[in-house]
Amino acid sequence: FPAVSAGWRISDEPFMQGTKSWLTDLKLRADYGVTGNQGFGSYKSLATMTGFGYYMYNGKSYQVWGPARNENVFLHWEKGKNWNIGLDWALFNGNLYGSFNYYNRTQQDLVGDYPAPMPPYLFSSTFENVGTMRNSGFEFDITWNAVKTKDFSYTLNIVGATMSNKFVHFSKRE
Protein backbone atom coordinates (compact mmCIF):
# COMPACT_ATOMS: atom_id res chain seq x y z
CA PHE A 1 0.00 0.00 0.00
CA PRO A 2 1.43 3.43 -0.94
CA ALA A 3 2.35 6.27 1.40
CA VAL A 4 4.15 9.60 1.15
CA SER A 5 5.19 12.20 3.71
CA ALA A 6 6.98 15.53 3.70
CA GLY A 7 8.22 17.99 6.26
CA TRP A 8 9.51 21.55 6.20
CA ARG A 9 11.68 22.76 9.06
CA ILE A 10 10.62 26.39 8.87
CA SER A 11 12.93 27.40 11.72
CA ASP A 12 15.98 26.64 9.51
CA GLU A 13 14.93 29.10 6.80
CA PRO A 14 16.93 32.32 6.38
CA PHE A 15 13.87 34.51 6.99
CA MET A 16 13.51 32.93 10.48
CA GLN A 17 17.04 33.80 11.68
CA GLY A 18 15.77 36.69 13.82
CA THR A 19 13.71 34.28 15.95
CA LYS A 20 16.57 32.02 17.13
CA SER A 21 16.66 33.65 20.60
CA TRP A 22 13.22 32.28 21.49
CA LEU A 23 12.14 29.87 18.68
CA THR A 24 14.10 26.64 18.98
CA ASP A 25 12.23 24.62 16.34
CA LEU A 26 9.27 24.97 13.97
CA LYS A 27 8.34 22.20 11.55
CA LEU A 28 5.34 21.76 9.27
CA ARG A 29 4.62 18.18 8.24
CA ALA A 30 2.06 16.35 6.12
CA ASP A 31 1.46 12.78 5.04
CA TYR A 32 -0.89 10.63 3.01
CA GLY A 33 -1.12 6.88 2.89
CA VAL A 34 -3.31 3.91 2.15
CA THR A 35 -3.40 0.99 4.57
CA GLY A 36 -5.02 -2.40 4.29
CA ASN A 37 -6.92 -4.42 6.84
CA GLN A 38 -7.92 -7.95 5.98
CA GLY A 39 -10.18 -8.03 9.02
CA PHE A 40 -11.25 -11.62 8.43
CA GLY A 41 -9.67 -15.04 8.60
CA SER A 42 -8.30 -17.03 5.71
CA TYR A 43 -10.72 -18.55 3.21
CA LYS A 44 -13.79 -16.57 4.45
CA SER A 45 -14.62 -15.60 0.87
CA LEU A 46 -14.34 -19.13 -0.52
CA ALA A 47 -16.70 -22.06 -0.59
CA THR A 48 -15.09 -24.54 1.81
CA MET A 49 -16.36 -27.90 2.98
CA THR A 50 -16.75 -29.25 6.48
CA GLY A 51 -17.81 -32.53 8.00
CA PHE A 52 -21.43 -32.93 9.11
CA GLY A 53 -21.06 -36.14 11.04
CA TYR A 54 -21.49 -39.70 9.79
CA TYR A 55 -24.17 -41.56 7.87
CA MET A 56 -24.75 -45.29 8.14
CA TYR A 57 -25.42 -47.09 4.86
CA ASN A 58 -25.38 -50.86 4.32
CA GLY A 59 -23.69 -51.35 7.66
CA LYS A 60 -20.88 -48.93 6.87
CA SER A 61 -20.26 -45.47 8.30
CA TYR A 62 -19.64 -42.67 5.77
CA GLN A 63 -18.40 -39.15 6.51
CA VAL A 64 -20.93 -36.54 5.37
CA TRP A 65 -19.51 -33.34 3.85
CA GLY A 66 -21.16 -30.03 3.02
CA PRO A 67 -20.54 -26.30 2.69
CA ALA A 68 -18.98 -24.66 5.76
CA ARG A 69 -20.21 -21.12 5.06
CA ASN A 70 -21.73 -18.87 2.45
CA GLU A 71 -19.34 -18.07 -0.37
CA ASN A 72 -18.59 -14.43 -1.22
CA VAL A 73 -16.19 -14.07 -4.14
CA PHE A 74 -16.57 -10.26 -3.94
CA LEU A 75 -15.06 -10.02 -0.42
CA HIS A 76 -11.84 -8.00 -0.33
CA TRP A 77 -9.61 -6.07 2.08
CA GLU A 78 -10.73 -2.90 3.82
CA LYS A 79 -8.75 0.13 2.63
CA GLY A 80 -7.91 3.08 4.85
CA LYS A 81 -7.01 6.36 3.16
CA ASN A 82 -5.30 8.61 5.69
CA TRP A 83 -3.92 12.12 5.64
CA ASN A 84 -2.49 14.32 8.38
CA ILE A 85 -1.13 17.81 8.64
CA GLY A 86 0.74 18.96 11.70
CA LEU A 87 2.99 21.55 13.27
CA ASP A 88 5.77 20.73 15.73
CA TRP A 89 7.34 23.56 17.71
CA ALA A 90 9.75 24.29 20.52
CA LEU A 91 10.43 27.56 22.34
CA PHE A 92 13.03 28.84 24.82
CA ASN A 93 15.76 26.23 24.20
CA GLY A 94 13.21 23.42 24.14
CA ASN A 95 11.74 24.17 27.58
CA LEU A 96 8.28 24.69 26.07
CA TYR A 97 7.36 22.46 23.15
CA GLY A 98 4.45 20.70 21.53
CA SER A 99 2.58 19.73 18.42
CA PHE A 100 -0.74 20.29 16.73
CA ASN A 101 -2.14 17.72 14.31
CA TYR A 102 -5.26 17.42 12.14
CA TYR A 103 -6.07 13.98 10.74
CA ASN A 104 -8.63 12.49 8.40
CA ARG A 105 -9.09 8.76 7.82
CA THR A 106 -11.59 7.23 5.42
CA GLN A 107 -12.04 3.48 5.88
CA GLN A 108 -13.63 1.96 2.76
CA ASP A 109 -15.13 -1.48 2.20
CA LEU A 110 -15.69 -2.22 5.90
CA VAL A 111 -15.86 -5.96 6.52
CA GLY A 112 -18.44 -7.57 8.74
CA ASP A 113 -20.53 -10.67 9.32
CA TYR A 114 -24.05 -9.70 8.27
CA PRO A 115 -27.42 -11.45 8.02
CA ALA A 116 -28.08 -13.19 4.72
CA PRO A 117 -31.46 -14.22 3.30
CA MET A 118 -32.21 -17.94 3.22
CA PRO A 119 -32.66 -18.89 0.36
CA PRO A 120 -30.66 -18.21 -1.77
CA TYR A 121 -27.93 -18.54 0.88
CA LEU A 122 -27.40 -21.77 2.83
CA PHE A 123 -26.47 -20.04 6.11
CA SER A 124 -28.02 -17.08 7.90
CA SER A 125 -24.93 -14.85 7.78
CA THR A 126 -22.11 -13.97 5.39
CA PHE A 127 -18.97 -11.83 5.39
CA GLU A 128 -19.41 -8.72 3.23
CA ASN A 129 -17.82 -5.37 2.42
CA VAL A 130 -20.63 -3.04 3.37
CA GLY A 131 -19.63 0.50 4.11
CA THR A 132 -17.40 3.52 4.47
CA MET A 133 -16.52 5.33 7.69
CA ARG A 134 -14.75 8.66 8.10
CA ASN A 135 -12.78 9.62 11.22
CA SER A 136 -11.32 13.07 11.64
CA GLY A 137 -10.04 15.14 14.47
CA PHE A 138 -7.53 17.42 16.03
CA GLU A 139 -4.77 16.44 18.48
CA PHE A 140 -2.44 18.60 20.48
CA ASP A 141 0.16 18.29 23.18
CA ILE A 142 2.09 20.96 25.03
CA THR A 143 4.96 20.26 27.42
CA TRP A 144 6.72 22.69 29.74
CA ASN A 145 9.91 21.82 31.57
CA ALA A 146 9.05 23.98 34.60
CA VAL A 147 12.04 23.04 36.77
CA LYS A 148 15.19 21.35 35.56
CA THR A 149 18.16 21.05 37.92
CA LYS A 150 20.84 18.46 38.51
CA ASP A 151 18.81 16.70 41.23
CA PHE A 152 15.21 17.57 40.38
CA SER A 153 12.95 18.16 37.42
CA TYR A 154 9.30 19.06 37.14
CA THR A 155 7.45 18.83 33.83
CA LEU A 156 3.87 19.78 33.00
CA ASN A 157 2.14 18.18 30.03
CA ILE A 158 -1.24 18.95 28.51
CA VAL A 159 -2.75 16.72 25.84
CA GLY A 160 -6.08 16.86 24.11
CA ALA A 161 -7.97 15.55 21.15
CA THR A 162 -11.26 15.77 19.34
CA MET A 163 -12.65 13.03 17.16
CA SER A 164 -15.60 12.73 14.82
CA ASN A 165 -16.76 9.38 13.43
CA LYS A 166 -19.34 9.21 10.69
CA PHE A 167 -20.76 6.43 8.55
CA VAL A 168 -20.58 7.90 5.08
CA HIS A 169 -22.07 4.90 3.33
CA PHE A 170 -23.60 1.66 4.56
CA SER A 171 -25.13 -0.77 2.11
CA LYS A 172 -25.02 -4.43 1.25
CA ARG A 173 -24.33 -5.73 -2.22
CA GLU A 174 -27.57 -6.70 -3.94
Model-predicted regions and their roles:
Residues 1-174:
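Extracellular/periplasmic, surface-exposed regions of secreted and cell-surface proteins
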